Amino acid sequence: MAAAAVSESWPELELAERERRRELLLTGPGLEERVRAAGGQLPPRLFTLPLLHYLEVSGCGSLRAPGPGLAQGLPQLHSLVLRRNALGPGLSPELGPLPALRVLDLSGNALEALPPGQGLGPAEPPGLPQLQSLNLSGNRLRELPADLARCAPRLQSLNLTGNCLDSFPAELFRPGALPLLSELAAADNCLRELSPDIAHLASLKTLDLSNNQLSEIPAELADCPKLKEINFRGNKLRDKRLEKMVSGCQTRSILEYLRVGGRGGGKGKGRAEGSEKEESRRKRRERKQRREGGDGEEQDVGDAGRLLLRVLHVSENPVPLTVRVSPEVRDVRPYIVGAVVRGMDLQPGNALKRFLTSQTKLHEDLCEKRTAATLATHELRAVKGPLLYCARPPQDLKIVPLGRKEAKAKELVRQLQLEAEEQRKQKKRQSVSGLHRYLHLLDGNENYPCLVDADGDVISFPPITNSEKTKVKKTTSDLFLEVTSATSLQICKDVMDALILKMAEMKKYTLENKEEGSLSDTEADAVSGQLPDPTTNPSAGKDGPSLLVVEQVRVVDLEGSLKVVYPSKADLATAPPHVTVVR
């Protein structure tokens, strides 16, 4: 009787166990009552699914603790998302150790303190050795564990926005403590001081400390070698000129001001040291320019094997593409970034096939089988902006899926479920292929996310499919790219970086191998039987560098307030040697 009751109360667990699923999403109506009946914790049976890689429990006001057994029962967990619940005021140590965990999202809870992690002593292994993204935003944290850096030494993104922190632990900025940390967000806290040791964060690209209680910004911040974006708005700084600069100037200007010692360049020894540092940087820049901008035959040889990524700023673009985000998508799949890429050549040989294969590989690896993020590519000529990213009930969402007829999302999902069952019967195994593998990511959602163009047509239904309307073909040279995620904005940017750099590699490969172009009849009709004029193609020259143009796309709310722009100065920062990013 007891087992029957559990199966009836938690059918998702029975299904996940039967189908040997790697991902599980618990949300939607009825979840709160079941968790309350389980004592405010997750059911113990959940921790008997050792194959789980992704677990999300969100929007449950009765969930106060994960429950004992999580670490022991889910050793292969890669992503743990427990956002918008009622976790707190403390968090029991049973959350770790989790040796494979890469993403931990505890945002929107009621946490006031975190348990100390493992790794205090040199002989103790870190509790979260593979963790890359930690989201603690929207809690009530007053302090961070002193050993956070030792617990998660591979951390790349740390979001502490909207807490009650008045300081960072000194260990966080210890030399070599977090060598990979590229994003630190701690806006809307009570921070009073920023340690000069922040300069030890060698990989830091973006820093958001807006709306705190800082009175000074350490000059050492300018020594962060990769820092591209900073936000100190809403702090009452003693240096009023600097306070005015952080409200309106670009990051480069602010760092330059800090680098020379503030107003007047400082005095005495400080000024001399600042001048020496600046002179050293100037010489390095000149050496780099000489290497990159040589003349004569040496430059010609270098150009032939180089590919330029030209970033077109929104202000330079007469018709920039914009994505508006409606509020209801926040509870479904809140994060999206977009970009426009011009200058691809998919006509030669297997170029299109390689392009589509690269997307599949990204979905499998970096996107963690679409659980962390989902990317979509569109024929730009068929995209009519501005675009709207929203969420709709399944019965109201209509799309023409790739290779299928128009259908409502509810009907499409049902059809895919039937096809999945048929696959299992034919192959006599539980695993399925294609789009059928991602259906469980919609479990429990009352609304489905979608991207809608200016004509009102749905061109994307993440994480399931794109629309036939914007299908990429061999004739496609200009593309609109989108990446969405239910996990974090940073993973969207990471996937977009990887996709664009992969496109650059493919462009270089196509040019070097000089494959012959080919068009199918259908594709030839699409361009009226005419191939593009090589003289108008910026990459057609044999002697100069090939060019891809990446246009910035702004994501705004319905009032027009900016949410994110891609690519920003901090994006595309890890380009390979043969790719030069021109901003």
Curated annotation (Swiss-Prot):
The modification Phosphotyrosine is found at residue 509. GO terms for biological process: phenylalanyl-tRNA aminoacylation. Keywords: Acetylation, Coiled coil, Leucine-rich repeat, Phosphoprotein, Repeat. GO terms for molecular function: phenylalanine-tRNA ligase activity; RNA binding. LRR repeats lie at residues 76-95, 100-121, 130-152, 154-175, 180-202, 203-225, 226-246. Changing residue 193 to D: In a colorectal cancer sample; somatic mutation. Residues 270-281 have a biased composition (Basic and acidic residues). The modification N-acetylalanine is found at residue 2. Residues 402-437 form a coiled coil. The modification Phosphoserine is found at residues 315, 431, 518, 520. SUPFAM superfamilies: L domain-like (SSF52058). Residues 260-300, 513-544 are annotated as: Disordered. PANTHER family: LEUCINE-RICH REPEAT-CONTAINING PROTEIN 47, PHENYLALANYL-TRNA SYNTHETASE BETA CHAIN AND LEUCINE-RICH REPEAT-CONTAINING PROTEIN 47. This is Leucine-rich repeat-containing protein 47. The lineage of its organism: Eukaryota, Metazoa, Chordata, Craniata, Vertebrata.
